[in-house]
């Protein structure tokens, strides 16, 4: 159906509080059950980013300035992939702190995907992705804190068109000045491993 291929309507909502400018997306879907499920998960991730700032002692009400935002990376064929960010600073901080998360979902089914769910069972996707990331690290001369040990089972990612972007939190594998190390990997590198009904599989059809 043509309707399924149209972009999903996304509404921006805000969390009102002094010195906080936290904006987050809410999807407007015809299926309200899926809408509620996906939007609840988005809000949970937004709150988790805020909690990380608070847990690390960077949040002081009325003093900490915090900006939360989002970017839509993919919105086609019913597949929505977006990133959520939280930036916090206050006078006693030498450097601002930033946290990043993401979510990828099929709005036609309400399924929210972990990285492993993009691929066929028992495929060696992690090995192939690790090899591709290692090659990019060398080619781009990305500074590391130690030896690259590969992606985790719940590795953060998002999808931009037909490209998979694997990323790491600040200080996970690189010094802070590198920011969030991101590794774009075109789908053709592992097309044989992609599950047909996953977001990447749908975008490739």
Description of each model-found segment:
Residues 1-205:
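Compositionally biased intrinsically disordered regions enriched in Thr/Gly
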């Amino acid at each position: 159906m043509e309707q399924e291929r149209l972009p999903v309507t996304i509404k921006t909502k805000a969390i009102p509080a002094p010195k906080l400018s936290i904006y987050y997306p809410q999807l407007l879907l015809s299926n309200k059950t899926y809408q509620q499920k996906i939007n609840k998960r988005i809000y949970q991730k937004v709150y988790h980013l805020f909690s990380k700032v608070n847990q690390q002692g960077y949040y002081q009400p009325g003093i900490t300035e915090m900006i939360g935002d989002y970017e839509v990376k993919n919105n086609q064929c019913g597949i929505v992939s977006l990133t959520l960010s939280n930036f916090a600073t206050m006078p006693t901080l030498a450097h601002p702190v930033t946290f990043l998360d993401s979510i990828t979902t099929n709005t036609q089914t309400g399924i929210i995907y972990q990285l492993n769910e993009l691929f066929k069972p028992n495929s060696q996707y992690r090995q192939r992705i690790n090899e591709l990331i290692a090659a990019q690290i060398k080619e781009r001369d990305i500074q590391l804190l130690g030896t690259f040990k590969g992606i985790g089972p719940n590795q953060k990612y998002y999808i931009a068109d037909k490209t998979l972007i694997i990323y790491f939190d600040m200080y996970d594998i690189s010094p802070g000045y590198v920011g969030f190390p991101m590794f774009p990997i075109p789908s053709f590198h592992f097309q044989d491993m992609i599950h047909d009904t996953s977001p990447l599989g749908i975008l490739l059809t």
